[in-house]
Curated annotation (Swiss-Prot):
Residues 370-391, 414-423 have a biased composition (Acidic residues). Belongs to the lunapark family. Phosphorylated. Phosphorylation at Thr-159 occurs during interphase. Phosphorylation at Ser-177, Ser-179, Ser-188, Thr-198, Ser-206, Ser-215, Thr-219, Ser-222 and Ser-231 occurs during mitosis; these phosphorylations reduce both its homodimerization and the ER three-way tubular junction formation. The modification Phosphoserine is found at residues 177, 179, 188, 206, 215, 222, 231. Residues 147-169, 200-247, 318-423 are annotated as: Disordered. InterPro entries: Lnp, Lunapark_Znf. Residues 67-77 are lumenal. One of its GO terms (cellular component) is endoplasmic reticulum membrane. GO terms for biological process: endoplasmic reticulum tubular network maintenance; positive regulation of endoplasmic reticulum tubular network organization. This is Endoplasmic reticulum junction formation protein lunapark. Keywords: Coiled coil, Endoplasmic reticulum, Membrane, Metal-binding, Phosphoprotein, Transmembrane, Transmembrane helix, Zinc, Zinc-finger. Endoplasmic reticulum (ER)-shaping membrane protein that plays a role in determining ER morphology. Involved in the stabilization of nascent three-way ER tubular junctions within the ER network. May also play a role as a curvature-stabilizing protein within three-way ER tubular junction network.
């Protein structure tokens, strides 16, 4: 009858079996802890009571029952000396007994753990994902701890750099424009995959010049995406993975500006409304905003595809002015003056013949100096000829009137007449 009833009984589920095993494991672990505590308690009690008994018996024997014979005293001494050895032996027996109990308990515990692990492996193979996940989270805390350790530690929130959000928006818009199909009938099934692929690109793109992005495995849908006619050869998956490149050619002004910023922009004449966007000719990415004055003359390298965008116009250059070095002119005039002072005037006239117009342009001071020099030479010649005449023709008139024989006054008159003629 019992066998028939056992056949009709329902087989316990894996959850019930695991619950029963969990209870047995907990009881065995509690028993192991209790066993260790009991061993310490019993050993301590043994030492405590044995020492008290040893002291009391030794005092009573010494005070009241000490025998008079020598042999009886030796026997009592042997008994007292063997008592500590007996206590030590009892202590070892207690330790061995408790250790055997703990070993048996540990063996049963290990057996239950191995069976539990086998059942959990069967659950992972046979049960559905949801049921297996619930069972593992409930009955396998060790694996849950390992998974928690393997998960990355959440770091501080990373503030996007200026231009990063704009870059992500442009990348997402470019992906949407690339992946839109030509046929309107095929548009609806491709939208969910496209929307799922867009956040991954937004997560993986980073600001130019920043740390390298995490490696992204290209999804099969991103490989299926077709390029637009006239679009660059770079694919969407390749654009998300690249090393840190050059910085933006010009900064991107923030969208959210305060009242003070707007007032300053109005006074200075700067702001987004007064700037032009630098768009790459190859990948159509936003590379900052340049001023109106420099927009036509800016050449920049794209921060995303590294394409060199030439300037639309060449900046006009003003003609170079002739450099006038005043120090060199002063040195030349000084050297010419020193050479003219060393050379005689005749040699200067031969080496540097001047035109009559240049002669007329000479200053009157130079003419006066030349006239004075000629007068001085004439007077010297007259003074040299005067003593010779006096020696050859000595006249009484000269002896009587020496003042009249002085030829200096007529010479002075002649010099004045020559000076007037030269003027």
């Amino acid at each position: 009858m019992g066998a028939l009833l056992a056949k009709w009984r329902a087989k316990p589920s894996t959850v019930e079996v695991l619950e029963k095993m969990e209870k047995d494991i907990q009881s065995l672990e509690e028993f192991r802890d209790k066993n260790q505590k009991l061993r310490k308690i019993w050993v301590a009690r043994l030492f405590f009571y044995s020492t008290i008994l040893y002291i009391l018996t030794s005092l009573t024997v010494y005070l009241w029952y000490l025998p008079d014979g020598m042999t009886a005293r030796l026997l009592t001494m042997l008994l007292f000396l063997s008592f500590p050895v007996l206590i030590w032996f009892v202590r070892t027996l207690l330790i061995l007994w408790f250790s055997r109990r703990t070993e048996r308990n540990n063996d049963a515990l290990e057996l239950l753990k191995t069976e539990k692990k086998k059942i959990l492996e069967e659950v992972m193979e046979k049960e559905t994902y949801k049921a297996a996940k619930l069972i593992l989270e409930r009955f396998d805390p060790d694996s849950r701890k390992i998974k928690e350790l393997e998960l990355p530690v959440p770091g501080p929130p990373i503030t996007p750099r200026p231009g990063q959000d704009l870059r992500q928006r442009t990348a997402a818009q470019r992906n949407i424009s690339v992946s839109t199909p030509v046929n309107p009938g095929q548009e609806s099934p491709q939208v969910p995959g496209l929307l799922a692929a867009t956040p991954s690109l937004q997560r993986d793109t980073s600001a130019p010049g920043g740390p390298p992005e995490r490696s992204v495995q290209p999804t099969p849908q991103s490989n299926i995406l077709q390029r637009r006619p006239g679009s660059p050869a770079t694919t969407v998956s390749g654009m998300a993975i690249h090393p840190p490149g050059p910085p933006l050619a010009r900064p991107i002004l923030p969208r959210e500006r305060g009242a003070m910023d707007r007032v300053i922009e109005y006074l200075v004449g700067d702001g987004p409304q007064n700037r032009y966007a630098l768009i790459c000719q190859q990948c159509f990415s936003h590379n900052g905003m340049a001023l109106k004055e420099e927009f036509e003359y800016v050449a920049f390298r794209c921060a995303y595809c590294y394409f060199l965008n030439p300037a639309r116009k060449t900046r006009p250059q003003a003609p170079r002015l002739q450099e006038i070095n005043f120090d060199r002119q002063r040195q030349r005039t000084d050297s010419q003056g020193s050479v003219s002072s060393v050379q005689p005037p005749a040699a200067e006239q031969l080496e540097n013949p001047q035109s009559p117009e240049a002669m007329e342009e000479d200053s009157p001071a130079q003419a006066e100096e030349q006239a004075i020099e000629e007068d001085s030479t004439c007077s010297e010649q007259q003074w040299e000829e005067a003593p010779d005449d006096s020696e050859k023709d000595p006249s009484p008139v000269a002896e009587l009137n020496p003042s009249e024989s002085n030829p200096s006054p007529p010479a002075a008159n002649e010099t004045e007449e020559s000076f007037m003629e030269t003027e």
